[in-house]
Amino acid sequence: IPEGKKIVMGEIGFKFVEKADSLYQKENIRRAGSKVNASLEDSQMFVYDYMYGTDMADALIQTVNTGFSGSIAWMLDDAMHSNEAPDKLKIWGFWNIFGEECFGAEEENVRPWYYAWSLLTRYMPAGTAVYRTDTTGEPFVKAAVSGKDGKYMIALVNVSDSPKTVKLKSNVLSSLSGCKKFIYSDGTLKQKGDCLLLPNDENLILHLEKGETVTMPAESLIVYTNYDY
């Protein structure tokens, strides 16, 4: 990115195009074919799975660390776009607002990846600074650190199908107090209603100069923050 310029990544979304992902693509097509209102040509049927949330978190963290000033997720609502016919929807959204009217009431349920995406973006408000992070020894784990006005977010994502243990260290930020900890993974979400994510732990102190050991569930996103909201 040229110095002094800003760039926004638009329409982040995953399609299974690599040979290594061929089995996922076969399953994606099978799921789309079994759903009456899904576009067979342009749907991401893994939006119902927690793994899609960690994939999208991974993409966002890489985008942030590369120097982009913002990003847009593809997409908000299934009801926004159809493909082969008016009733063949592009299944990519956080939900389907017309579920009860046309496509089944369960389609209005908030899907897992909403919680991963909204958690990260909630704690990267406009004007946030992004700090350089280095990850070593574990290719399935990515990290991002950002902050504004003395408040910080530390985000870790594990896209592996097995648990990982990592160590958080900083020679700049010696400690971080008053932290909340959020854990996004299957079976760990704490929610209020169908849209608000609650912390799994609160009032934590991270001793970053000494190092903090963190155990991450498979396919998980962990966020520490001392923002007071």
Positions of the model-derived regions?
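Structural recognition of the beta-strand scaffold that forms the well-ordered cores
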Residues: 6-11, 69-74, 153-156
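Carbohydrate-binding surface patches
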Residues: 135-176, 184-187, 219-222
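Short helix-capping segments at alpha-helix termini
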Residues: 1-3, 174-175
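Active-site region of glycoside hydrolase catalytic domains
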Residues: 3-18, 65, 147-148, 164
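C-terminal beta-strand-rich structural cap/linker in extracellular carbohydrate-active enzymes
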Residues: 197-229
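Extended hydrophobic-aromatic, low-complexity segments
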Residues: 20, 82-85, 155, 163-167, ...
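Aromatic/acidic polysaccharide-binding cleft in carbohydrate-active enzymes
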Residues: 14-118, 122-142
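Trp/Gly-enriched beta-strand surface patches
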Residues: 175-209
